Amino acid sequence: MNRRGEERRCIPNVSTVRVRLMFQDEASFGRINKPKYCWCPKGTRPSVPCHHIREYRYAYGAVEPQTGESFFLVMPYCNTECMNIFLRELSKTYPNDYIIMAMDGAAWHKSGTLEIPDNIELFYIPPATPEMNPIEQIWSWLRMHGFCNEIFVSLEKVVERLCETICSLDHATVRSITHRSWILSAV
């Protein structure tokens, strides 16, 4: 049974269904930038443009550390409606696989209106343990490789850069960032 007390389908035949262990999270990307370290000529002080415009978009992501496969959507909000869209699209992307997905306990992950597809099973990591969710390091990588020391003139430019940076992630990079021996030994 799942957390709502409803029957969940069992994996019909493990030899014919691929089981994936994926880790899911969301992160905000917006027009508020954070200056990072940078190179500059000796004896000079670096100058980095900065502004504080509170406009955001949210990247929803799921990664599979064993293979380095990943799935991302950029959404306007962090809420149950967007989470339902994410789960539906993830399920459509892997229709013949059974996905066991670890995630934090955000309110929209446990909402009564959350629609969990039949080929996805959710489980929650303990509160205040981001180190147990390897996708957290993917967000750091995206910020470091796509958002350092730059201002964006519009929210659309933020989304463009976010999509470009996500598309630059390959399986080997995702695997190297999300590799945890305790995950791989469990799979």
Task: Give the residues covered by each predicted segment.
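Short functional hotspots at interaction and active-site rims
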Residues: M1-V187
